[in-house]
Swiss-Prot record:
One of its GO terms (molecular function) is Ser(Gly)-tRNA(Ala) hydrolase activity. It comes from Nautilia profundicola (strain ATCC BAA-1463 / DSM 18972 / AmH). Its main location: cytoplasm. This is D-aminoacyl-tRNA deacylase. Its EC number is 3.1.1.96. PANTHER family: D-AMINOACYL-TRNA DEACYLASE 1, D-TYROSYL-TRNA TYR DEACYLASE.
C-alpha cells in the first residue's frame, strides 16, 4: 500500500465538472492498493496518515493535532512499477473490485480518527490542491 500525502490549505475533487468533495486545511491523500495488502496494513497506514507530524513550523503537529481534514483520493497508478522502460507497469496494483473494498474500509478507518472526505472510486476525477509548503510525503506500508 502506497500513499502520497500533500499538506494543503484547500483541496477539492470533481467528476464531470461537478464538485464531489472539498476540504480546507489538512491532507490531500492519493492512495494506491497493492495485491499483497491486507487489513493489518490498512490499519497501519491509516494510523500513520493521521499521526504523521508534518504541520507546524517545526513539523511538531499531525493533521489530528490541528483538527484538519483529509481528502482521500483512490489512485491505482500509485503502485506502478517504473524501473524499466518508459511505460508504467501496473501488475502490482490490486484488482479493482478488491481495491474498492479496501478503499471503502480506508475511508471508514480514517473517519474513526478525523473527518475524511472521499473521491469516487473508478471515476475520472479532477483534483485541485493548494499545497501548503509545499510538503509532499510518500508513505509505504
Amino acid at each position: 500500500m502506497k500513499a502520497v500525502l500533500q499538506r494543503v490549505k484547500h483541496s477539492s475533487v470533481s467528476v464531470e465538472g461537478k464538485l464531489i468533495n472539498e476540504i480546507n486545511e489538512g491532507l490531500n491523500v492519493l492512495i494506491g492498493f497493492e495485491k499483497d495488502d491486507n487489513d493489518e496494513k490498512l490499519k497501519k497506514m491509516a494510523k500513520k496518515i493521521v499521526s504523521l507530524r508534518i504541520f507546524g513550523e517545526r513539523f511538531e503537529k499531525s493533521v489530528a493535532d490541528i483538527k484538519g481534514e483529509i481528502l482521500l483520493i483512490p489512485n491505482f497508478t500509485i503502485p506502478a512499477i517504473t524501473k524499466k522502460g518508459t511505460r508504467p507497469n501496473f501488475q502490482n496494483s490490486m484488482q479493482p473490485s478488491t481495491a474498492k473494498e479496501f478503499y471503502d474500509k480506508m475511508v471508514k478507518e480514517l473517519n474513526n480518527y478525523i473527518p475524511t472526505k472521499a473521491g469516487v472510486f473508478g471515476a475520472e476525477m479532477q483534483v485541485e490542491i493548494t499545497n501548503n509548503g509545499p510538503v509532499t510525503i510518500i508513505l509505504e506500508v
